[in-house]
Amino acid sequence: MAETRLASLDDSMASRLPVHSQTLFDAKTAKKLTFEAIASKLGRSEVAVAGMFYGQVQASGEDVEALSELLGVPKESLSKMTNFPDRGRSGPMPPVEPLIYRLYEVVQNYGYSFKAVMNEKFGDGIMSAICFQTNVEKEVDEQGATWAVITLRGKWLPFTRF
């Protein structure tokens, strides 16, 4: 059986994140839990749960209760997770972490193509990143190559005439 490898918080990022981020990652590592396992207990997507750990997604009171119980962390130390997140400050721009840079590169290389196709399909507007869902899946093709499948689902918001 393959060993489960866990995502952890890099020390160089900790100062840019909320205090509860370190607490959550330490408890996650100690309990040997994946984001998938935590998400299953919370009834949330694993990307949303990871976003909570990085301070980019607001947690509900129920999320805090469940995290406290699952991770063995006092609720009081997680109480600020229900505050409004200060998004977009967790890393430098452009990104320097290779995987995150590849995602940035996808937008650099295909952003205008996405825009053109979306404008043709939906009209003049934008895809919301607020009324939004995302998912990450793993696929293995017929040749045995592993592929990452990232789904981005955002509500279409047409620009209004004023």
UniProtKB/Swiss-Prot annotation:
Record-linked SUPFAM superfamilies: Cyanase C-terminal domain, lambda repressor-like DNA-binding domains
GO MF, one annotated term: DNA binding
Catalytic residue list: R102, E105, S128
Superkingdom of this protein's organism: Eukaryota
Any one biological process term the GO annotation gives: cyanate metabolic process
Catalytic EC class: lyase
SMART domains: Cyanate_lyase
Keywords: Lyase
EC number(s) per entry: 4.2.1.104
Reactions it catalyzes: cyanate + hydrogencarbonate + 3 H(+) = NH4(+) + 2 CO2
Free-text function comment from the UniProt entry: Catalyzes the reaction of cyanate with bicarbonate to produce ammonia and carbon dioxide.
Homology family: Belongs to the cyanase family.
UniProt name for this protein: Cyanate hydratase
Native source species: Pyricularia oryzae (strain 70-15 / ATCC MYA-4617 / FGSC 8958) (Rice blast fungus)
